[in-house]
Design a protein with these regions (language model features):
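Hydrophobic beta-strand positions that form the internal "hydrophobic ladder"
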Residues: 54-55, 105, 151-154
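Residue-level detector of Asp-centered blade-edge/turn motifs that repeat once per structural unit
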Residues: 50-51, 100-101, 149-150
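Short, solvent-exposed loop/turn segments at conserved positions within beta-propeller repeat blades
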Residues: 115-121, 157
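Short loop/turn segments that connect beta-strands within beta-propeller blades
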Residues: 70-72, 128-131, 167-170
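Beta-propeller domains
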Residues: 58-82
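Conserved small/polar residues in nucleotide/adenosyl-binding loops
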Residues: 176-177
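Beta-strand-rich domains and repeat architectures in extracellular enzymes and scaffolds
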Residues: 34-64
């Protein structure tokens, strides 16, 4: 009998807990759904460093590119700042990518959407060691700029033509029309 009453008490406690927690749940309304209450939060774009210890990200409303430590999240170094970069007339930028050797940045600004995820923008190359920002090319906005595997050239599209910019010489040549 003792075992039966103990089981009965445990069952009643368990049942009452279920009812308590069930009735405390707030109903989801249409307003909750349409207001974006359950919308996921984006994190800033993060580019991992080759050393595996650091990452690069844009801060201050896309006016700086900093190197941070994964372990602490603290800034270790500033790679680019629109206020201190030489020959920089940008107030802010829209995005960036890092060369494979991590000596140059490809920074773009004044983006114009084309279709879904594609866009045209004014691209710039930034030499980190010299703190110098230069336009990638003259002649209009570029698309799909990407570094070569060795980081010495940048391929891009302008007016449906494919170009290559040789960073060592500062020249760009038409590759395919």
């Amino acid at each position: 009998i003792y075992h039966y009453t103990t089981m009965k008490k445990v069952f009643l406690i368990f049942l009452s807990l279920i009812f308590i927690f069930t009735f405390q749940v707030k109903a989801i309304t249409l307003e909750d759904i349409t207001s974006g209450k359950f919308q996921s939060k984006d994190i800033a774009e993060v580019y991992p460093s080759a050393d595996g210890v650091h990452y690069f990200t844009a801060t201050n409303g896309n006016t700086r590119i900093v190197k941070c430590e994964y372990r602490t999240g603290h800034e270790v170094d500033t790679l680019f700042d629109v206020k201190t970069a030489r020959e920089c007339n940008l107030e802010q930028f829209d995005g960036f990518s890092l060369s494979p050797d991590e000596k140059h940045l490809l920074i773009y600004a004044d983006s114009e959407p084309i279709y879904r995820r594609s866009f045209k923008a004014t691209y710039y190359t930034f030499e980190i060691r010299r703190n110098l920002l230069k336009p990638l090319s003259d002649g209009g906005k570029q698309q799909a700029a990407v570094y070569s595997p060795n980081g010495r050239m940048v391929a891009f599209v302008r007016n449906n033509n494919i170009f290559i910019k040789k960073l060592d010489y500062g020249t760009d040549c038409l590759l395919y029309t």
